[in-house]
A protein has these predicted regions:
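Acidic, Mg2+-coordinating phosphoryl-transfer loop and its flanking beta/alpha structural elements
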Residues: 98-119
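Generic hydrophobic secondary-structure packing signal
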Residues: 61, 84, 108-111
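Short phosphate-binding loop-to-helix
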Residues: 81-92, 105
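Alpha-helical substrate-recognition element adjacent to the catalytic core
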Residues: 1-82
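Alpha-helical segments flanking ligand/cofactor-binding loops in enzyme cores
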Residues: 44, 89, 106-110
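Short loop/turn motifs at secondary-structure junctions
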Residues: 6, 73, 92-95, 111
Length: 119
């Protein structure tokens, strides 16, 4: 990527995008999520060219996700599924690349400049 386009925002959902979508539970509840070892490799290549941020609606697993995202050098926002569309809209859909995997992401993907879903 040659040019710097800081008005462009790359917004990623955490669960199902950075994770495999599975949670590990104990008798105390959610204790672990599984992340890919190389999640930040591609993001490191583009982070100086656009704004990158992460969202999650997982209240119980937020600390786990927040730690992983912070370790990668980014910020995680807690955004409920009902608030998700409005949150992304603040960044102007024509300036948003969005990556999500859930039913609450469909309208955001349709309205964003580029919408991406994991395989």
């Amino acid at each position: 990527m040659k040019r710097n386009n800081k008005n462009l925002s790359f917004i990623l959902d955490v669960d199902g995008v950075l994770t495999n979508g599975q949670f590990i539970y104990s008798e105390r509840g959610k204790v672990q999520k599984i992340f890919g070892a190389h999640d930040s490799d591609g993001l490191d290549l583009i982070k100086n060219h656009l704004k990158i941020l992460f969202i999650s609606s997982d209240k119980r697993g937020f600390k786990i996700s927040s730690k992983r995202v912070k370790d990668m050098g980014f910020k995680l926002y807690y955004v409920t599924n009902q608030q998700r569309f409005k949150f992304v809209e603040k960044y102007n859909f024509q300036n948003v690349i969005f990556m999500g995997d859930g039913v609450y992401d469909v309208e955001i993907i349709k309205n964003s400049k580029y919408g991406i879903t994991p395989r």
